[in-house]
């Protein structure tokens, strides 16, 4: 597609006039906005689908169950994914800032993720039991560390190439197209694989995700990025000192990290939705296809709305998402007491869908807020500090499940609702960007 057609498509999608607004990016970068916008959209759509095909919350537990991996290792999937992607970021952000072009710090990690999934696919076909679980967790750890590095670079590249006020729409469009692709994949799983998922299906899902990551890397490599400032390259010790200095002096950064940590209650609650729903309506709830379809529909429904909302006020969006999460959790807590006709697979799927919508809103709002409020020259450090502290919180949050063991699933869900109530109060302290 030539540049004129790209510009027309970009102007139509973003409601941009003849005089393009290029708030917070250079004049040279402004000329490349349409092409870069669509490259990021299609790159993101592929990665969104890949993330759903091999997910610690859906398909990987299925794989572990099929391979006979001990249950204790299954519980380590989400902590390994989150901690692996978040904790190392503070130590590599300075390395990224030492380079004028940051896109390669997304491209190379994406290829590492592709090869990690490729190796995982062959583990699925050739091992089982404890050894399979350990190998997959190891590969997931490598995948997650690469993801963390790419996350830093992505925010920097977006800030350099997409105007402020259009970033939320771009992120939402990625998620929408990815949601459509996910929906198609979920429907196929639900209709074509009725009960047990054989190894060839799981192998195919993992190989497909690997290919999608490789294609996404190729697309991202084509982004036209202007050279950026390279000041600020430091040792990890200096990085820690500077990060701590920012944390101490910037009260808005502290409040944001606290708010983001509390919003983690939304994804943390989702597995307990699955467990409680399965207890109430039977094993049909555990259908991988239903869960994947719910994720796809949620992204299709929520992303366009969330994108425009986040561009208007990502702060208010965080508050709104927390309120939605509270309401949905309270409804789920009441689910066991519903009448026989209401308590079924379809009503549960709807509650799960709302939870996924809320999670999508939480992710988009905090990403947009951080990109918009962080100072340009220190953005990577702000992102790295935020992600590292959230990674530490995730490790702690892995122990929250003891509440469910001691007091039951509904008390566990009420605990998460309390966290979201605190998130609303914390969100009110944030300044507008």
What are these regions (language model features)?
Residues 39-57, 77-93, 109-113, 139-223, ...:
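Substrate-agnostic recognition of the 12-TM MFS/MFS-like secondary transporter fold
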């Amino acid at each position: 597609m030539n540049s004129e057609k790209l510009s027309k498509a970009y102007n139509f999608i973003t409601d941009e006039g003849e005089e393009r607004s290029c708030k917070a990016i250079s004049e040279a970068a402004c000329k490349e906005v349409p092409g870069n916008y669509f490259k990021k959209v299609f790159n993101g759509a592929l990665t969104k689908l890949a993330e759903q095909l091999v997910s610690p919350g859906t398909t990987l537990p299925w794989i572990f169950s099929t391979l006979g991996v001990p249950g204790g290792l299954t519980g380590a999937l989400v902590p390994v994914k989150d901690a692996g992607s978040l904790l190392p970021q503070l130590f590599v952000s300075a390395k990224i800032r030492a380079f004028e072009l940051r896109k390669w710090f997304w491209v190379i990690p994406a290829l590492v993720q592709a090869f990690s999934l490729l190796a995982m696919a062959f583990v699925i076909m050739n091992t089982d039991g404890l050894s399979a679980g350990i190998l997959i967790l190891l590969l997931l750890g490598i995948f997650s560390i690469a993801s963390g590095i790419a996350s830093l670079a992505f925010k920097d590249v977006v800030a350099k190439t997409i105007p402020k006020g259009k970033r939320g729409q771009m992120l939402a469009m990625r998620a929408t197209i990815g949601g459509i692709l996910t929906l198609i994949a979920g429907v196929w799983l639900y209709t074509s694989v009725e009960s047990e998922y054989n190894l060839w299906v799981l192998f195919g899902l993992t190989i497909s995700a690997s290919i999608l990551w490789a294609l996404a890397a190729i697309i991202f490599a084509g982004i036209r990025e202007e050279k950026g400032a390279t000041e600020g390259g430091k040792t990890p010790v200096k990085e820690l000192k500077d990060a701590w200095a920012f944390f101490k002096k910037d009260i808005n950064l502290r409040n944001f990290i606290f708010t983001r940590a509390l919003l983690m209650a939304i994804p943390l609650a989702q597995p307990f939705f699955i467990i409680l729903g399965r207890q109430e309506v039977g094993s049909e709830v555990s259908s991988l296809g239903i869960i994947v379809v719910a994720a796809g529909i949620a992204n299709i429904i929520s992303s366009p709305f969330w994108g425009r909302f986040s561009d208007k006020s990502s702060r208010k969006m965080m508050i709104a998402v927390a309120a939605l999460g509270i309401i949905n959790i309270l409804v789920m807590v009441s689910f066991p007491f519903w009448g026989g006709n209401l308590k079924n697979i379809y009503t549960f799927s709807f509650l799960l869908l709302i939870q996924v919508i809320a999670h999508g809103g939480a992710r988009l709002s905090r990403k947009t807020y951080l990109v918009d409020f962080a100072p340009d020259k220190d953005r990577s450090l702000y992102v790295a500090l935020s992600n590292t502290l959230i990674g530490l919180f995730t490790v702690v949050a892995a122990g929250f499940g003891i509440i469910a063991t001691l007091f039951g699933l509904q008390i566990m869900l009420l605990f998460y609702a309390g966290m979201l109530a605190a998130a609303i109060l914390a969100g009110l302290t944030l300044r507008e960007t």
